[in-house]
Amino acid sequence: MKLISKIVLVTVILLTAGSVVVNAQNKIATLDLRKVFDSYWRTKQADIQLKERAKEFEKQRQEMIDSYKSANDEYKKLIDSANDSAITADEREKRKKDAEAKLVEIKGIEANITQFDRTATTTLNEQRKRMREKILQEIYELVNTKAKAAGYTLVIDTAAETINNTPVLLYYTKDNDLTDEILKQLNANAPTEYLQPQSTETNAPAK
């Protein structure tokens, strides 16, 4: 029993000593990455560009939809005219063939719309991904530079969440928070139209 107590005591001492060493060697800073990303003027610029691109796609799609509706109207008229009892058999046959050709055209427009939707979605997603990666890389590089200059060995994202959508950090102080400093430098040369007054409070962790 005494032996077990001694072992437990030694273990506690070693763990405590190790904790002291780790704390002495590490200087930790915090950063609300979601707030930095959302408030960075280039993110706002990218959002505007994506919306403009989406509007262009929507305009093209609407033109295709209009063509589709027009073709359907023409098809219905051809079917009605082909059933006209006053026309000759040859004329009826001709109109039926015209209706069949118009139906093929309609099917082609449908296929084009489906392909267009797929291509537009892929294009927008890829553009969004490229912009996001580029912006995050700029943020990471600045954080890395700032952290090294200030002697920080670790920068923790306070907006991070677990797979269960709960905060990774339940408590932390803002003594070494880099959020506002990083944002100030990122937006130092921002065009005025992209700047808005920044809140001093951090946003909720990103989901």
Language model region names:
Residues 1-9:
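Bacterial N-terminal signal peptides that target proteins for export
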Residues 8-18:
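Bacterial N-terminal signal peptides
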